[in-house]
UniProtKB/Swiss-Prot annotation:
Family under the similarity heading: Belongs to the COX20 family.
GO biological process annotation, one example: mitochondrial cytochrome c oxidase assembly
Membrane topology: Multi-pass membrane protein
Source taxonomy: Eukaryota, Fungi, Dikarya, Ascomycota, Saccharomycotina
One Gene Ontology MF term: unfolded protein binding
Origin species: Eremothecium gossypii (strain ATCC 10895 / CBS 109.51 / FGSC 9923 / NRRL Y-1056) (Yeast)
Protein name in UniProt: Cytochrome c oxidase assembly protein COX20, mitochondrial
Length: 194
């Protein structure tokens, strides 16, 4: 269902929001043109009715999520979902795995060197794997969230920035300013030779 990243409905590499938007939506038949339309006249968006009914689709999704049960979610799980290729496609999985394995080696090695007990070292290694994976996962997610926020701020800054290339330069005004400057008598220089 919605919480399992490998369900049959999910496509790899496509966020859930995009998949919901790409889901088939009931489209209305072609709308008749407004009564005040004349051939060749441009139609404005405000003159037409919306193509999609956003209220019903949101309520349908809410009803579908309410009906989701653990049994329905379990039916979507397959053995292929646990392949290394699919797991490597999950964002932050690699970083979490590397941090977990590093923590496992460090915790297991230090415990083994200190206590000389392989069972105890293995237990601490597994604990280090779990804890390191969680820390690596959360750290990667935080970095991704921050980078997405920076990218969004950059997008907003570029959108709000004035685009000088859209204005045509007024060459006549510039030429007039240059000619006026050349017509003025030369000013007395600020320096003086003696």
């Amino acid at each position: 269902m919605a919480w399992w990243p490998f369900s049959r409905n999910n496509k790899p590499g496509v966020p859930e929001q995009d998949q919901v938007a790409a889901a088939p939506v009931q489209q209305r038949p072609a709308e008749p043109l407004p009564t005040n339309y004349t051939p060749g006249q441009r139609l404005l968006l405000e003159d037409t009715r919306p193509r999609f009914d956003t209220q019903s689709s949101a309520s349908q999704q809410a009803v579908q999520r309410e009906r989701a049960t653990l049994a329905d979610a379990w039916k979507t799980v397959r053995w292929e979902d646990f392949s290394l290729e699919r797991m490597a496609g999950i964002p932050c999985f690699r970083d979490a795995g590397m941090a977990g394995f590093s923590a496992m080696v460090v915790a297991g090695s230090v415990t083994f060197l200190f206590h000389k007990n392989p069972v105890r070292a293995a237990n601490w290694g597994v604990g280090g794997l779990l804890l390191g994976s969680i820390v690596g996962w959360e750290q990667c997610r935080m970095q991704r969230r921050r980078s997405f926020q920076v990218a969004e701020m950059a997008r907003q800054t570029v959108a709000a920035k004035e685009a000088p290339m859209l204005r045509k330069p007024d060459n006549a005004q510039k030429a007039g300013a240059v000619s006026q400057a050349s017509e003025l008598p030369p000013k007395k220089p600020w320096y003086r030779f003696w």
